[in-house]
Amino acid sequence: AVKTITLNLVSPSANRYATFLTEIRDNVRXRSLDYSHSGIDVIGAPSSRDSXLNINFQSP
């Protein structure tokens, strides 16, 4: 499966950029892993069942 995330550079804002970064973070972290039981999610090791993350930059 492919998840596409787009950053709109036509009318950028701090909120859109923050949302863009959150979407990337939410789609690459392995929720079953955390850093030293701190509750901080980490990126999981690659597997043969991984999905792809497609990042688009929309410009004028």
From Swiss-Prot:
Annotated InterPro entries: Ribosome-inact_prot_sf, Ribosome_inactivat_prot_sub1
Molecular function terms, GO-annotated: rRNA N-glycosylase activity; toxin activity
EC number(s) reported in the record: 3.2.2.22
Tree of life domain: Eukaryota
GO biological process: defense response; negative regulation of translation; regulation of defense response to virus
Keyword flag Glycoprotein: no
Keyword annotations from UniProtKB, A to Z: Antiviral protein, Hydrolase, Pharmaceutical, Plant defense, Protein synthesis inhibitor, Toxin
Recorded catalytic activity of this chain's protein: Endohydrolysis of the N-glycosidic bond at one specific adenosine on the 28S rRNA
Broad enzyme group: hydrolase
SUPFAM superfamilies linked to this entry: Ribosome inactivating proteins (RIP) (SSF56371)
Function, as annotated: Single-chain ribosome-inactivating protein.
Further comment: Possesses high antiviral potency and low toxicity to normal cells in culture and to intact animals. Capable of inhibiting HIV-1 infection and replication.
Recorded family membership: Belongs to the ribosome-inactivating protein family. Type 1 RIP subfamily.
Name this polypeptide is given: Ribosome-inactivating protein dianthin-32
